[in-house]
A protein has these predicted regions:
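N-terminal presequence-like segments and the immediate start of the first folded domain
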Residues: 1-71, 75-88, 94-148
């Protein structure tokens, strides 16, 4: 696992301090976005889906999907120079809010006090039951020779 070449995005005219983070240990993006972006000591994770990175399979049920999503989140965090205990904000998306308690029981296994700020919302998810995005502190810096 590694940060994707820690290169700026000059073709998009973006700030060179925005560093895309990518790992094959989490679900590949389903569209034109990064798994995460590191910027100024923060790591911004895109919505992580419950897709197994090796098989591409989506597990059945809220509990299994919650574990899959949170494993993907942990892998992206680690790749981006962070960890679960450095997460400051989480947004959890549930296809059905009646699944809140089941999701929450799994979520507790992957976090500890002081818990990050969190919002849980009902969302129209395409073929999945759970998705999660997060913001965390990180240690990723631009590669040598890149502007800071």
């Amino acid at each position: 696992m590694q940060v994707s070449q820690l290169s700026p995005l000059p073709q998009l005219g973006r700030n060179p301090r925005l560093l895309p983070v990518s790992t094959d240990q989490a679900a590949a993006p389903a569209g034109p976005y990064s798994q995460a972006i590191a910027a100024n000591g923060l790591l911004f994770l895109s919505g992580q889906r419950p897709v197994d990175s090796e098989s591409g399979a989506i597990p059945e049920g809220v509990e299994a999907q919650s574990h899959a999503v949170l494993r993907n989140v942990v892998n992206v965090l680690q790749t981006g120079g962070s960890a679960p205990d450095r997460v400051v904000k989480v947004t959890a998306h549930l296809a059905d809010l009646k699944d809140f308690d089941e999701f929450n029981a799994v979520y507790k296994l992957y976090s500890s006090p002081p818990y990050p700020a969190r919002t849980t919302v009902g969302s129209q998810l395409r073929g999945i039951l759970v998705e999660l995005d997060a913001i965390a502190l990180c240690d990723v810096q631009p590669a040598e020779g890149h502007p800071r």
